[in-house]
């Protein structure tokens, strides 16, 4: 690597690092704004123990943890939806929703849209209940491990073991 390439690579790393730091700083600032607005630093908030943290600790596998995280993210989206008309904290909520979008949905708009469709489905609607029950078998089959997947088989060479004996 020549000197010019090294300088360009260094500048790129510095820019990316500082922008990441700036984004994280803005994210934490907006969380602090929400904490202040909701008076979430008050000692009585801890009464009854944590809301999500103990549950998250119980799940170690990444795939299992994703299930719990999806429920928690769903909660936050519902919370932000209920507060969407509050102009005092709108910027903070938008910043945090954007960070959730990047971290949880890998910046995939289609994943976010599907997720939002799911959390908007009304559970008390009879038509929705009927459709859900109608689709239950397919959903359960989709959840089950795929037992009939073709597994790669080793070739059965009849001369394979004989060479080792000679």
Swiss-Prot record:
Comp. bias (Basic residues): 148-166
Give a Gene Ontology cellular component term annotated to this protein: extracellular space
Question: Where in or outside the cell?
Answer: Secreted
Query: Which InterPro entries does UniProt cross-reference here?
Result: 4_helix_cytokine-like_core (IPR009079), Interferon_gamma (IPR002069)
Glycosylated residues in this chain: 39, 106
Report residue spans for region: Disordered.
147-166
Query: Which UniProt keywords are given for this protein, alphabetically ordered?
Result: Antiviral defense, Cytokine, Glycoprotein, Growth regulation, Pyrrolidone carboxylic acid, Secreted, Signal
Presence of keyword Plastid: no
* Family label: Belongs to the type II (or gamma) interferon family.
Quaternary structure (record)? Homodimer. Interacts with IFNGR1 (via extracellular domain); this interaction promotes IFNGR1 dimerization.
The protein, known as: Interferon gamma
Q: Which gene encodes it?
A: IFNG
């Amino acid at each position: 690597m020549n000197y010019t390439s090294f300088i360009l690579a260094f500048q790129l790393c510095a820019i990316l690092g500082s922008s990441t730091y700036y984004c994280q700083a803005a994210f934490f600032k907006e969380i602090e704004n929400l904490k202040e607005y909701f008076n979430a630093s008050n000692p009585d908030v801890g009464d009854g123990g944590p809301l999500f943290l103990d549950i998250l600790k119980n799940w170690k596998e990444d795939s299992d943890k994703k299930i719990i995280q999806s429920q928690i993210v769903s909660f936050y989206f519902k919370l932000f939806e209920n507060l969407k008309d509050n102009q005092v904290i709108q910027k903070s909520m938008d910043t945090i929703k954007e960070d959730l979008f990047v971290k949880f949905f890998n910046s995939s708009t289609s994943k976010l849209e599907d997720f939002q469709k799911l959390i908007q489905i009304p559970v008390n609607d009879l038509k929705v209940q009927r459709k859900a029950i109608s689709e239950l078998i397919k959903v359960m089959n989709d959840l089950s491990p795929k037992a009939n997947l073709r597994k790669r088989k080793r070739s059965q060479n009849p001369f394979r073991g004989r060479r080792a004996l000679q």
